[in-house]
Curated annotation (Swiss-Prot):
Methylates ribosomal protein L11. This is Ribosomal protein L11 methyltransferase. InterPro entries: Ribosomal_L11_MeTrfase_PrmA (IPR050078), Ribosomal_PrmA_MeTrfase (IPR004498), SAM-dependent_MTases_sf (IPR029063). GO terms for molecular function: protein-lysine N-methyltransferase activity. One of its GO terms (biological process) is methylation. It comes from Pseudomonas putida (strain W619). It is found in: Cytoplasm. Belongs to the methyltransferase superfamily. PrmA family. It is an enzyme of class 2 (transferase). Pfam families: PrmA (PF06325).
């Protein structure tokens, strides 16, 4: 069915006021959107930052009168409205639209990431079937791609691989399909653990091949290979811990790092690893090396 969509151009200071007012006048959903393609990276803990120029989108039943909505908003806020507009939009199958846009992707020489509902383009390739679930990694982001390509270029046969911050499990599962003996995944999010388990089952990975833990339950270990696609801040603060999780002679690959953060992250690992040249893609970097 169609919907009435109301759009307001607001500042961060106005966000809560207008969100509450829109819900008060009958909006069935309220969404914040970036108005100027302004990135927000690594916000402070316990904060939910907004862009300096934000669009607030609200959906109403199609028979709602936009002029009445605007009048009630003025009454509730006691102020003239910021820039605003209303339009009727047709309903669509958002999940199907997203699925149609998620296509198989190749990484390196052997590895394909294939949506679970899609046929693999190369039957004889290493095909990882993925249902990302709750917006965990799909391979479309440059940092995930950098890690997948790195894994494809390693000799993983017989190794134990640790995926630190496993998300969808895409890196751990890829390592297993590329020949790793076993993999360990850890994440602070219980839903990530479940997504990883589901994706492992979808790819025929035996339970004993992939162990999944919340960080507080992960056993002491030293892996042959560690991959961590998280954020620069945690990578720096956790450098002693992550370095200790790699055996001497073992391999490390890190991403989730902005280009301007690369040198700082590399410096945090330089004492313990012989580092490779930093690889840059679309403003993001990968740092890799071998444990001394």
């Amino acid at each position: 069915m169609p919907w009435l969509q109301v759009r307001l151009a607001i500042s961060p200071e106005q966000a809560e006021t207008y969100e509450d007012a829109l819900l008060e006048v009958g909006a069935v959903s309220v969404t914040f959107m970036d108005a100027e393609d302004q990135p927000i990276f690594e916000p402070d803990l316990n904060t939910t930052p907004l862009w300096s120029h934000t669009h607030l989108l609200a959906l109403f039943e199609a028979d709602a009168d936009p002029e009445q909505v605007f009048a009630h908003l003025r009454l509730l806020t006691g102020a003239e409205l910021p820039e605003h507009q209303a339009e009727v939009i047709e309903d669509q199958d958002w999940e199907r639209s997203w699925m149609d846009n998620f296509q198989p992707m190749r990484f390196g020489r052997r590895l394909w990431i294939v949506p679970s509902w899609h046929e693999a383009p190369e039957k004889d390739a290493v095909n990882l079937l993925l249902d990302p679930g709750l917006a965990f990694g799909t391979g479309t982001h440059p940092t995930t791609a950098l890690c997948l390509e790195w894994l494809d270029g390693q000799q993983l046969e017989g190794t134990q691989v640790l995926d630190f911050g496993c998300g969808s499990g895409i890196l751990a599962i890829a390592a297993l399909l590329l020949g790793a003996r076993e993999a360990v995944g850890t994440d602070i999010d219980v839903q990530a653990i479940e997504a990883s388990r589901d994706n492992a089952q979808r790819n025929g990975v035996a339970d004993e091949k992939l162990a999944l833990y919340l960080p507080e339950h992960m056993p002491a270990m030293q892996a042959d290979v560690l991959v961590a696609n998280i954020l620069a801040g945690p990578l720096v603060s956790l450098a002693p811990q992550l370095s200790g999780l790699v055996r001497p002679g073992g391999l490390l690959a890190l991403s989730g790092i902005l280009a301007e953060q690369g040198e700082e992250v590399a410096a945090a690992y330089a004492a313990d690893f012989e580092l490779d040249p930093i690889v840059v893609r679309d403003g993001w970097v990968r740092i890799s090396g071998r444990r001394r």
